[in-house]
Amino acid sequence: MPPLWVVTELMTFGELSRWFALTKDNKVKSAVAMDLGLPNREVLEGTLQLLSYIRNICAHHGRLWNRQTVKRLPNIKRFRADLVIVEAVVDGGVQAQPANFIYNALVVLAYMLRHQSADTSFVQRAVDLVQTRSAEQLKAMGFPIDWRSRPCWSI
């Protein structure tokens, strides 16, 4: 039997997300979440679902940049200073929830990557790319006006 890391490298992102969701050992799920810098397994499961959804849009050449995602990030208090929060209807009531734009997914991805590798170039490359876009395009992607001054994007 090959080591687990070999198996996971052969999985698609969707398969990995579903495999994680079907894992019964919550201690393992919590350990993986902590290893990625996320507070708990529920947040990791929701984040994996969103990232899998976004990956599929990209893989099938779908329009992503100005699209609201069907999946929404879970509330992550640790990242609240960076996330764009909106009032959303949840289970018949109105709650503060992360907005379902690509911006919030990029925030969580940046935090996860930095947690794994402090010297990741993802944040710098994302900033460089985003700064080539117009204010209207940034707004359509859910970027707040002050995005560059938020902690996540400090370089």
Specify the residue positions occupied by each region the protein language model found.
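Long, contiguous internal "core" modules enriched in hydrophobic/ aromatic residues
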Residues: M1-I155
